[in-house]
C-alpha cells in the first residue's frame, strides 16, 4: 500500500446473506515485505460498545482504540469476518480471502478525491457487523521449519501453509477436492504435476492447480524459495501438510 488504506470490516455469512444475498468475508494476511515502520491494524485494543463506536467514528477517534502492529516479512494475521482492520502505508501483503466483495468502510482519514469529495462510508452497516471482542494478541504465531510445509490458517473457507525450502518437495493432493494455489514470495522454483506438466514460478507470480491434480513436485531453482500454498476449504480428515509431503 502506498498510503494507509481505509479502516473497514466485512460481515459474516448470515448478515451478508440477509443484507446482500452474498457470502461474508473471512481473510488472512501474510506480510511479504514491509518498509521500516510499516504498520497494520487488527482488532480493538480496548473494549468499546456499539454506542462508543458510533461516537468515535463521528469525532474521528476510532483509530485510537484499534490495535496497531509494526510489521516485518513473515508476519501473519487471521481476520475472521467482523474484525475491524486496515493495511498501513509501506506494507506489501499477500491476502487470502473468502470469495466476497462485501466491505463496510468505517473511516478513510477524511481524504478527498480530485473533485473534493470524500469516499462513501458504511458506518451504520458496519456497527452490526463488528465483533467487539478484545484479544490479547491478534497475530498468528507459528514456527517456520526448513523444507517442510507449516500450516498457518485452517478455517471453514480456506487452508494456507507456508513453504520455506532449499530442497525438492513432493505434495500429495489425491484426497483433496479443491484447486490449489501457490504464491511465490521469494526465489524461483519449478512445479511439475503428475501428468508431466512443468512450469517455472518466480517471486511475485502465482500458479493455480486444478482440482484434478493428484500430486506435484516442487524444485527450487537456486537458493531459498518461499511459497504460500492455499486451497478452498478446510479438510480436517486429511493428513496434515507435513504428512502430505515427502
Describe the role of every protein-language-model region:
Residues 246:
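Gly/Pro- and small hydrophobic-enriched strand-loop and loop-to-helix capping segments
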Residues 71-89, 201-214:
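Conserved metal-binding segment of the jelly-roll/cupin
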Residues 84, 188-190, 215, 224:
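Structural motif
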Residues 236-243:
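Conserved small/polar residues in nucleotide/adenosyl-binding loops
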Residues 198-234:
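C-terminal structured interaction module
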Amino acid at each position: 500500500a502506498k498510503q494507509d488504506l481505509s479502516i473497514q470490516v466485512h460481515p459474516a455469512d448470515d448478515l451478508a446473506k440477509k443484507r446482500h444475498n452474498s457470502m461474508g468475508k473471512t481473510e488472512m494476511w501474510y506480510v511479504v515485505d514491509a518498509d521500516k515502520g510499516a504498520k497494520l491494524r487488527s482488532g480493538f485494543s480496548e473494549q468499546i460498545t456499539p454506542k462508543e463506536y458510533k461516537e468515535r467514528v463521528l469525532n474521528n477517534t476510532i483509530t485510537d482504540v484499534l490495535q496497531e502492529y509494526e510489521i516485518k516479512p513473515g508476519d501473519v494475521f487471521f481476520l475472521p469476518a467482523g474484525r475491524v482492520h486496515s493495511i498501513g502505508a509501506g506494507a506489501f501483503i499477500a491476502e487470502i480471502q473468502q470469495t466476497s466483495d462485501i466491505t463496510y468502510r468505517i473511516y478513510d482519514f477524511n481524504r478527498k478525491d480530485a473533485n473534493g469529495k470524500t469516499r462513501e462510508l458504511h458506518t451504520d452497516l458496519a456497527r452490526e457487523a463488528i465483533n467487539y471482542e478484545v484479544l490479547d494478541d491478534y497475530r498468528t504465531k507459528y514456527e517456520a521449519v526448513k523444507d517442510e510445509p507449516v500450516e498457518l490458517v485452517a478455517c471453514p473457507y480456506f487452508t494456507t501453509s507456508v513453504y520455506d525450502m532449499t530442497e525438492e518437495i513432493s505434495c500429495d493432493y489425491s484426497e483433496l477436492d479443491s484447486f490449489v494455489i501457490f504464491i511465490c514470495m521469494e526465489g524461483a522454483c519449478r512445479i511439475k504435476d503428475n501428468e508431466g506438466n512443468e512450469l517455472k514460478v518466480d517471486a511475485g507470480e502465482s500458479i493455480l492447480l486444478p482440482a484434478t491434480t493428484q500430486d506435484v513436485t516442487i524444485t527450487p531453482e537456486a537458493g531459498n524459495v518461499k511459497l504460500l500454498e492455499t486451497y478452498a476449504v478446510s479438510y480436517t480428515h486429511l493428513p496434515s501438510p507435513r504428512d502430505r509431503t515427502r
